[in-house]
A protein has these predicted regions:
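Serine-dependent protease modules
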Residues: 1-177
C-alpha cells in the first residue's frame, strides 16, 4: 500500500520531459566551465594580480584533454582554468583558435578516466523547427539546461574581427537567467 501512495504522488513525466532529462544526464559530464584571467601589475606595489576577464562554457572533445569553447571566452587570457562537472580544475593551454569562427581549442592534462568526451552528431538532417537543448554555465552558474528550436539554417553573422561566418545554425533558446 505504501508503494501505491508513493506512485500516486510522484509526478508523471511525459516522453519529451524524460528525453530532456536523459540528454541532460548523458551530456552534462562533458560540459566544462572556462574562466579567463589576465595578469595585471599594481602601479605602486608592482605586485602581480590575477584579474578575472571572462568566463564561458566548453565541452570535452576527446579523452586526450581537448576542450572546445568560444574564442571570445579566451581572447586575451594570460591564464585559462577549466572546471569539470566533478569540481576538479585544470589549467588549460590554447592549442588553436579560429577568431573568424569564434572557436578555440584548449588542452588540459587530465587523466583519461575522468574525461567524458561529448559524442558528436551530424547536422545534415537538421530542419527548422527541430528541438535543440543547450547546456551551459551562464554567469558562473553551473550546469544550466535550456530548450529551444532550430530557427534558421545557413545564416551569416559577423565575428569579433568583423569577418563573415557562413552556414550558421540559428537557434532560439536562452541560456542566461
Amino acid at each position: 500500500a505504501a508503494t501505491d501512495a508513493t506512485n500516486a504522488t510522484a509526478p508523471l513525466l511525459i516522453t519529451d520531459e524524460a528525453n530532456n532529462i536523459a540528454v541532460f544526464e548523458a551530456a552534462s559530464p562533458s560540459v566544462v566551465f572556462v574562466t579567463n584571467t589576465q595578469l595585471r601589475r599594481q602601479r605602486f606595489s608592482l605586485n602581480v594580480l590575477e584579474i578575472p576577464k571572462g568566463s564561458g562554457t566548453g565541452f570535452i572533445w576527446d579523452d586526450d584533454g581537448l576542450i572546445v569553447t568560444n574564442f571570445h571566452v579566451v581572447y586575451g587570457a594570460n591564464k585559462i582554468n577549466i572546471a569539470l562537472q566533478s569540481g576538479q580544475q585544470f589549467e588549460a593551454k590554447v592549442v588553436g583558435t579560429s577568431p573568424e569562427k569564434d572557436i578555440a581549442l584548449l588542452k588540459i592534462d587530465a587523466p583519461k578516466e575522468i574525461l567524458s568526451p561529448l559524442p558528436l552528431g551530424n547536422s545534415d538532417a537538421l530542419a527548422v523547427g527541430r528541438k535543440v537543448l543547450a547546456i551551459g554555465n551562464p554567469f558562473a552558474l553551473d550546469t544550466t539546461l535550456t530548450v529551444g528550436v532550430v530557427s534558421a539554417l545557413g545564416r551569416e553573422i559577423k565575428s569579433m574581427n568583423n569577418r563573415t561566418i557562413s552556414n550558421v545554425i540559428q537557434t532560439a533558446e536562452a541560456i542566461n537567467p
